[in-house]
Amino acid sequence: MPYFIQRLFNTCKSSLSPNGPVSEEALDKVRNVLEKIKPSDVGLEQEAQLVRNWPGPGNERNGNHHSLPAIKYLQLHECDSFSIGIFCMPPGSIIPLHNHPGMTVLSKLVYGSMHVKSYDWAEPDQSELDDPLQARPAKLVKDIDMTSPSPATTLYPTTGGNIHCFKAITHCAIFDILSPPYSSTHGRHCNYFRKSPMLDLPGEIEVMNGEVISNVTWLEEYQPPDNFVIWRVPYRGPVIRK
């Protein structure tokens, strides 16, 4: 039945704008609907069965393998206010560390297990640097394994772990709502990051408000490897009436 996904779409439409969520209360409405999602709500019943049949981590491919497991992306909707999509990830697949500039992101694990690592910039107001490739200090927000069903997560433009990466432990799917969505026109590019290899960077810094942040991680922008590919595939779940 299309009831769930239609209700979620309608809630997004009334709660999200080209500038992001219209209010925290509106964002809560979207989150409350998203919490109830099941694989059958988006046509992923068969994919979810793969988790039960998965033989275990012995067959997992290392993230440095020459041919990384293929990740699939199903786009349900995109407009100026928000985008809705699902990443289906096989065991061992990785979505590298990436950001969501000026965006609020709701994510929900639909099935399976994954490892999530996320950061926020130590000084978020320094987003416009003379050299965008120079290393910037970031603070760790999350470094955990997640298994469905687990609560939906919320990333804000400067808090909540806006820069994150995923590694699939089992077959898994992550449902994403971005508001506003990525847009080259509006300067919201998806940039990828890695830990800086420089050894002389400080592990502790004092930011502009006087706060001292220890265990700093320095991140630098980079191009992900050529074998990192996300395949766009058609969404075949219940139809959304727009």
UniProtKB/Swiss-Prot annotation:
Its EC number is 1.13.11.20. One of its GO terms (molecular function) is iron ion binding. GO terms for biological process: cellular response to hypoxia; detection of hypoxia; peptidyl-cysteine oxidation. GO terms for cellular component: cytoplasm; nucleus. It is found in: Nucleus; Cytoplasm. Optimum pH is 9.0 with CGGAIISDFIPPPR peptide as substrate. InterPro entries: PCO/ADO (IPR012864), RmlC-like_jellyroll (IPR014710), RmlC_Cupin_sf (IPR011051). Its cofactor is Fe(2+). Binds 1 Fe(2+) cation per subunit. Belongs to the cysteine dioxygenase family. This is Plant cysteine oxidase 5.
